[in-house]
From Swiss-Prot:
Domain of life the protein comes from: Bacteria
The keyword Methyltransferase belongs to this UniProt entry's keyword annotation: no
Family: Belongs to the acetyltransferase family.
CDD domains (alphabetical): NAT_SF
Protein name: Uncharacterized N-acetyltransferase YhdJ
Domain N-acetyltransferase: 2-142
InterPro entries tied to this protein: Acyl_CoA_acyltransferase, GNAT_dom
GO molecular function, one term: acyltransferase activity, transferring groups other than amino-acyl groups
Keywords assigned: Acyltransferase, Transferase
Amino acid sequence: MIHMKQLTSKEEWAESYPIMSELRTELDIETYLQRLEACVQKESYMLFALYENTAIRALCGALPRVSIHKGEHLWIADLVTTAPCRSKGYGKMLLDYASDWARKAGLGFVSLSSGLQRKDAHRFYTDKMGFTIESYLFRKPV
């Protein structure tokens, strides 16, 4: 049985690490848990999980944001499905779940960024999820 929920306890966060580490390969569990706690406390970050029976199969990390330019929206910071479960529609289910959360919260839209090399992900976002490409995201170390 498939079900989704927001993960709120440190135990649930630790349980999510093996899935998130498929996306965030540079993070060990200690760093992951420290950053996750900081994101929740400082940024109102939410971690949604898709379960197949009792096992986490996919994760979506999101946070509400507001900008002068676009107003209130939901930013998808992380989206990952464990490799053996890809192409089962789990990413779509989680993005739909996050979009429903945003709609109920009165937010105007959902946005995300995706690495330039992730061509399959880009097709998924545009062709299957209805996202449009509006900008590049730039980064500079300080």
